[in-house]
Amino acid sequence: MKLIPLVPVLCLLPAILVAETRVNTSAGAMLVTEMAAGLEEPWAIGFLPDGDVLITERAGRLLLISQGQRREITGLPDVYAEGQGGLLDIMVPRDFAASNELWFTYAEPGLLGGATAVGKALLSPDRTELTNFQTLIVSDKTRSGNHFGSRLVEAADGSVFVTIGDRGTGPDGLEAQDPARIEGKVLHLTRDGNPATALPGYFPGVYSIGHRNPQGLTVDADGALWLVEHGAQGGDELNLVQAGRNYGWPVISYGEKYGGGQIGTGTAQPGMEQPLHYWVPSIAPSGLMIYSGKAVPLWQGDVYRQSEQRFHRAAGPRSGLRRRTHHKCANRPGARCD
């Protein structure tokens, strides 16, 4: 029986699978192959056009996996690797073969703690170092080590969406509701790092508001922007994000405060969006992908969502997002996943 490689499906896992394993699925038998081993808190993966792989480690290392060999790439700024911070996402633009450009999100250190930062750099021709690193945008620094957000995705027109968490100010903090701030927002930037969206009364580049800690973001074939974000104690959400919309945090939520207690005014408020789906109890959603590969036609358009404990597949947007299956993956015992 022919085995289909499963690597394109599993690329959003927070850890790299380290064994070659045969997996039976609804689309037939598939082979999960080892890409790398011995990684330390890998956070994101970027695929280069020739098949080389870039991996970020939260402590601040960028690794290149090429022909089975691993080496570190230098040239990154210092990162604030405390709490949930560190070196976070990486995005390889579609024009990388011509531009050599890479985008990053990371926690920038400061006297008052860390801040979510967005930057870009050029990868040297020999792929050993980053050059011309530019910091494009930085949130306010806070002593909280939580809720950096930090997912990057490229739109069809080459512009970039990025998520910024509310920075862990809690249900009583209203940073996510303030359109003049970037915390608790989705931002929309040009490839130069300038605002790609300008909404009246909003900080330049703010695309949507009212987010807690969004860590999964993807664009579907029709250009729609999909997002998953962590709730508090319950209330994780899947949202279809549109410009100028308010997604409610912390005024409305289907979760509750840690230890119990209502968040905000309840679960609904005029002028605030309802999630397409929410989870109680929490599932800790950390990645999101809509399958567009050719290897498994049956899964075209299906939604893949990674959590700390499971890898889920659901029928795609045109099928009403009904859940189909889930695949259990590695868990970190005792971790607080928010």
Predicted ranges, named:
Residues 205-237, 242:
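Repeat-solenoid scaffold signature
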Residues 19-31, 125-130, 192-200, 254-271, ...:
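Blade/loop signatures of beta-propeller domains
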Residues 121-128, 187-196, 241-248, 315-323:
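Short loop/turn segments immediately following beta-strands, especially the blade-tip
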Residues 5-15:
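Bacterial N-terminal signal peptides
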Residues 211, 322-338:
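Conserved blade-ending motifs and adjacent loop-strand segments that build the rim/top face
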